[in-house]
Amino acid sequence: MKECMRELKAYKAAMQFLPSGCLAAEAEAEKQEKLSVEMIGSQTGPMSCSEQTELFVRASGQKTGMVYTQKLDANASDVIAQALTNSEDSAAKKAEPMAAADYWEMDEAKDSNYDQAKTLVSIETLKNKAKTLAGQLEESFGCQVRLNLSQTILTMGIVNTNNIEETASVCRFAAEAAADGYEGYACALTLDELSPEPFIHDFSNRRFLDMPTILAEPGVYRAVLSSQAVNNILITAWQMFTAKRARSGATPLAGKENKKIFSDCIT
């Protein structure tokens, strides 16, 4: 457990003096700090840094009400009072319980091997990774790639009148690639885990599926079928030529080898 989030300290203090009729209160914060860089071909595009914090405040009397806000400078006591007022419009017949011990904690933050400080990178490191990844994708795709690479720190915290005070934080990296009508996405907990392979595999599959239909002239052809195509043919044949036996309660199996099963086309 880390120190109480700065955004929740005022709510922790306000919970010592709840408004009249308020029996319990809770405040939860979700903060995202995002650093991103964009590559367009071999050129570095725009870079950006942003931060957003959302607050969810609940208060209970006979019933429970909530307030959602991004106004971090709002008076905590007033927000709790507003949540209590909102409880009057609740359709519930009784108050909802506030979080108890072990309410939540990110799995990554629980992992003894996870060290967020070691996963954070500088803007230069992020830029170099974006340049390398974009170059690898362009070489494979054979066309210009637009790549956005971002580092996001997600911090979540909660305080309430059950003496719950929890904070957890995790860093995630995400890459978004666009090229020739293709759009792909991948994410990882460390920058080193982001590789071009998932994009290349997805790009190849989509290009194959987008191939135009070609009408073939009547004749005899030799063709190589994928395992999925073979399975689809076999399943279709099974459904077409064994349904009669299946409906009658007899075995749907064909019987002896080379014995006809309802069709002169299949033996």
Feature names for model-found ranges:
Residues 33-89:
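N-terminal alpha-helical targeting/anchoring segments
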Residues 56-61, 96-111, 174-188:
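Short, compositionally biased low-complexity segments
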Residues 24-28, 56, 66, 174:
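Ordered hydrophobic segments in well-structured contexts
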Residues 1-4, 64-69, 108-121, 183-194:
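Charged, low-complexity surface segments at secondary-structure and domain boundaries
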